[in-house]
C-alpha cells in the first residue's frame, strides 16, 4: 500500500479501490482506508482532478476520481471546514474545471459539471468573479463552436451552474448571476438557432447523426433556466423577448410537423421544454409573463391546440399511442389556469415595489383586451364540456377491467397529471372567475344540450359531461339553482332508472354521487340529505360495481365530515351503512389504498355520530382489527394501514366510553408495539399509538372494570418519548396526567419513570411551550389534591427529590422574572403545598436558601438564570421576597376560585409563626377582606363563582357526553379541593385563633395593636355576615 501522496500512488490506490476483482476484499478495504487518510491532505483534490482529466487512465479509475473529487468539494471546499482545501489549490482547480469539454463519456462530464456548479455556488462572485466571463470566452471560441462534443459539454456545465445558482435565495450569488447572464444569453441563443436550423431543415438527418438535435435541446434547456432564474423582469430585456417570440414560432412549427418529427425520441422533450419555459414564467410572475410582447401569441397557440387537438386527446391511449397530446394539452390548460387565477384575484400578490402595482394593472388590462374576450371564454367552456370533461374510451376500459384500481387513481390523481381532472379544475376556475358571463350561459346550455341527446353511448357520455359541469359549478351557480328540486325531479330518478343498460346505470350513479358530493356542502337541505342517505344505502346494498360503491363511500364521508353535519338526519341509516361498510365493502376490496379509505371512513362515522352507534356494533367493528393489524405489521406494502387502524381503535375507545375496557385485549398489545422504542414500527406508529394510549386512560371507568396492571407495564415507554418527541410532548403529558388521576400517590411515586420525567420537566420548566407548561402544573396540582394525610410526607419528599420544589422557587426568584400570569400559576402550586404543610414548605425554603450561590457567584451567572436572592441574604429576607412577589402576582388573578387557592396558601404560612410572615399580616388580611367582599360562600365553603369554568355541569352533561377522566377530575376537585370544602371565614377565624394560641394572649393583643384598626373592623364585619344556603 502506498503511503506518500503523489499522482502515481493515487492512481494505484484508485485502481485497487475500483477494480471489480477486489470487491469487498482486504485490498479494496485498505485502498478505501488510504483514500480517507489522504483526503484531508493538501493537494489531494488537485491530483484527483489531474487523474480524471487524464484520458490515458482507465474509465473506472477516472470515474472513481471524479466521484471522490465531487464529494471532497462538498466536505472541504468551504474555508471554514476542518481540513479545508487550501486557497491556492482551489485556485488551481478552478483554472482547470472547463478542460474536460472534449470528454466523450457523458456520465463523467455530468459529474464534473455538478462539481463545477457546487464550486460556483461557494465561490461566485467573491473568489470566482470571472465565472461568466470565462464561459463567455469559451462560447466565443470558433474552434469550440464547430465541435459538437465540446459545445455540448460546455452547455452541460452552464446548465448545472445556472441551476445551482438559481436556487440560492440568500447571499450575493443569485443577484450577481442575474447581472452576468446577459453576457452568455445571446451566445447560447446563437448556438440554439444554428443547431435547431440544422436538424429541422436537413433532409438527410438520421438516427446515427443526432448531434445537432442533442445540442439544440440542451441549449434550449439552458435558455429556459437562464430566462426563468436569471431575469426578475424578463419583459424588460429585448434579447429575452426576442428569443421567446422566436421560441413560439418554433413551438408552432414543431407542433404542426408532429408527424415528421415524432420519430425522434427527443422531439417530445422539445415540446415539454418550451411548455415548461412558458409555465415557469407564468408561475413565477403572471404579470411579467403577460407583459411579454408575445404572451398573447403563447396563449393563443395553446388555446388553439386545446381546441384543435381535443378529438386526438380524447381518443389517445397512453399504452398504445402514447400520451403526447394529453400532456401538451395539460400544459396549456395549466398556463391558462395561472392566467385565469391571476385575473380572478385581480393581481392580489405581495408587492415588492411601488412599480409592481403599475405592472399588475397593465398586465390585467392587456390580457382582458388582447385575449380574454367573451367569445373565447364561452368557446373554452364548450370545448371542455364536449371533449375534456367526458369520460374517455381508455378510462371506460380501465374502469371495466380493474374498477378498484381505477377509482383509486381518480381519488388520488393530481390535476396536474391527467387531462380530465385538469380540465375539471380549469372549468371550476372559469366558472368562479367569469360567473356573471358563464352562469346563465351554462344553465341555458345544460338545458338545451341535454334535451337534444340521443340514446347512443356517445351521447350518454356527453350527458355525463353535462352533469359533470353542473357538479363542478356548484359554488358559482348555487344562488340561481334549486338543488333540492333538481335532486328529486332529475338526479334521483336518473340514479334509480333501471330501464337503461347496466353500463350506463353505473356511469350515471357514479355521477349522481359526485354531484351530491359537491352540492351537499354548498346548498342542500336536511330533507334532501336524508334522501341522499337513503339513496346511498340502496347503492351500497344493491350495487356491485366497485367504482359506484367507492364513490358512494367517498360522498358519505364528505357529508359526514361536513361542518354542518347533523347526525340525527343520518341516524336512521347509520347502522345499515356501518354494516355494509364492515360486511360488504371492506371484505371485497383488495388494494391497500382502498382499505385505508374505508377504514378512515369508518373512523369518521364513529366519531361524528358518537354516541349513536350501539355497543354491539362497535364491538363488531373492533373484531376486524386483529387480522388487519397482523397484515399491516408484517407486510411492508400494507404498513400504512397500521396508522388507520390505530385511529379507528382510538375512535372506538372514545365512542365506547366507560365500556372501552372491551377493547383492552386488542388495544393494549397494539399500544405496546406502537410505543415501544425498540419496535421496528416505532417511528411510523408511535404518535398515533400515544394518542390511543391516552384515549384508553381517559375513558377508563373504575365503576365498570378494575385497572389493568398492563397499563403500568407500558409506563417505561413514556421516558423515551418525553426525551425525543418534544413536538408531541402535550400528548405524553396528558398520559401522565391520566395516571396521576387513576393511581394512588404511593403507586404513582413508586414508579421510577414518573420520577425521572419529573426531574426532566423540573429542569426545563420555563423553557416548555405554554401547553406543556400548563399540563406539568396540572399534574403536580392533581397529585397534591390526591394527597391523603398518610401520603403527605411522601408527596413532599418526592417533590424534593425530583427537583419540583427547587424548580418552583427558581422560577419565582429569577431576576428576569416570567410574566405575573406565569408567576401566579407557579405560585399556585406553592400555595397548594403550603396549605397541605406550611412548615415543611418553609423548611425546604431554608434548605433552598442554604444551597443558593453567593451574591458574587450569582453576579457571574448568565442573566437567564441569575436570581434576586443569594446565600448572603438572611433567610427572613428570602421569605420576605417570596411574600412580596406572591402579593404582587395576586393582583393579576381574577378567577375567584384561584384567588381562594392563593389565599388559603399564603394564609397557611401564618401557622409557621415566622416573623417575616407575621410582619405581612396586614397585607394578608387585606386579601381576606377583598375576597370576602367579592364572594358569599355556603357553610361548606363553596360558592357559585368557584364553578364559572367547570367542565362538568348539568348543561355540559346533557349536551356533551363527558369522559370518565373528566368526571374523575371533577370528583377529585369536589371531594378534595379545599376551595370547595373549606369555609374561608372559618379558615380565617381558625388562623386568628392559631395566632392567639401561638403568641399567647398578651403578645397576641400587642400584635393586634400594630394592625390598622379599620382593617380589623372591616375583617370583623365580613366574618359576621351569615353564609348563603348550601347548594343541594
Curated annotation (Swiss-Prot):
Residues 31-103 form the Importin N-terminal domain. The keyword Nucleus applies. GO terms for biological process: protein import into nucleus. GO terms for cellular component: cytoplasm; cytosol; nuclear envelope; nucleus. SUPFAM superfamilies: ARM repeat. Interacts with GTP-bound GSP1 and RFP1. Associates with the nuclear pore complex. Present with 6300 molecules/cell in log phase SD medium. This is Importin beta-like protein KAP120. It comes from Saccharomyces cerevisiae (strain ATCC 204508 / S288c) (Baker's yeast).
